[in-house]
A protein has these predicted regions:
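Multi-bladed beta-propeller domains
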Residues: 7-24, 50-66, 94-109, 139-157, ...
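Residue-level detector of Asp-centered blade-edge/turn motifs that repeat once per structural unit
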Residues: 32-33, 74-75, 117-118, 163-164, ...
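Structural motif
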Residues: 2-5, 44-46, 87-92, 131-137, ...
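Blade-level signature of beta-propeller repeat domains, shared across WD40, Kelch, NHL, RCC1
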Residues: 251-269
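Loop/turn-rich, solvent-exposed surfaces of beta-rich toroidal or solenoidal domains
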Residues: 197-233
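Beta-strand C-termini and the immediately following turn/loop, strongest in propeller blades
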Residues: 31-32, 37-43, 79-86, 115, ...
């Protein structure tokens, strides 16, 4: 298997290959400094400096079974990871330089997806109370009670905050196949942003609020599998002016987590 870490620049509509690996690497986050990317592979976390691309291991202590749901705090001081243990996936925080993880999620399974712009709240998805579907939740960075935001039927996933923190974008299959939805950061005013025949996942608004990036699967796809023909699409934040900008083999692990450059000029995948 070969994996490719790439960057798409909006202005030039060009692709730059950062790294090629002979194993599976996934889910790039762009660090706030703009100088490196964070990726996962083989249950571990790696930092990739853009000036001299290579995979530098990040110390995650006992957490050695990471999935592709990880991210960096807005101020760059913390990393959140989702690590599999006996209860399933759990969320932990650790220093950005690495260190021993601190458990955040009071229950499991939990998968992180978004960080509020003020750095105080985490958005994630979880299965609770015997429900067979996944809902969107939030919790403070210091732990405490979790708040369930989605209540209806259907699988909801991939929550990510608007740059002003007022809204959360997510995908949900409540009305059939997965489409892009948006709601208030408190769970209010849940509504489908648009509908088409594609199976749409993992919406990510750009830091400047000008664009919405999402992953599109072929019609009829169930879940978010890997190794399918997919497209990365851009839209306006209100769901208008949708267009496909890249097509390749991918899916699970392509853009599960926020991947925009800090200046909104590019995204990694």
């Amino acid at each position: 298997m070969k994996s490719f870490l790439e960057i798409y620049t909006l202005a030039s509509q060009s692709v730059h290959q950062v790294l090629q690996a002979d194993t599976l690497i996934e889910a790039p986050n762009w660090e706030p400094s703009g100088q490196s990317l964070l990726i996962n592979g083989g249950g571990r976390l790696y930092r990739v400096p853009l000036d001299a691309p290579r995979m530098i291991p990040v110390d995650t202590g006992f957490a050695q079974s990471l999935n592709n749901d990880h991210g960096i705090s807005p101020d760059g001081s913390l990393i959140v990871i989702s690590n599999h243990r006996d209860r399933g996936s759990e969320m932990f925080l650790l220093p950005a330089s690495g260190g021993e993880p601190r458990l955040i999620s009071p229950d499991a399974p939990s998968w992180w997806h978004g960080w509020s712009p003020d750095g105080q709240t985490l958005a994630y998805v979880a299965a609770r109370g015997g429900r067979r579907v996944i809902d969107v939740y939030t919790i403070g960075v210091n732990g405490g009670p979790e708040t369930r935001l989605t209540q209806g039927e259907g699988h909801c996933d991939g929550p990510d905050y608007a740059p002003d923190g007022s809204q959360i974008y997510y995908n949900c299959d409540r009305d059939g196949h997965a489409q892009i939805w948006v709601m208030g950061a408190d769970g209010s005013n849940q509504r489908k942003l648009f509908a088409d025949d594609q199976v749409n996942w993992f919406p990510h608004p750009s830091p400047d609020g000008a664009h919405l990036l999402y992953l599109a699967y072929p019609t009829g796809t169930t879940g978010h599998p890997a190794n399918l023909p997919v497209a990365l699409c851009l839209a306006n934040p209100d769901g208008t002016h949708r267009r496909r900008v890249l097509e390749f083999t991918g899916g699970q692990g392509t853009i599960n987590v926020p991947c925009w450059s800090p200046d909104s000029s590019a995204f990694a995948y």
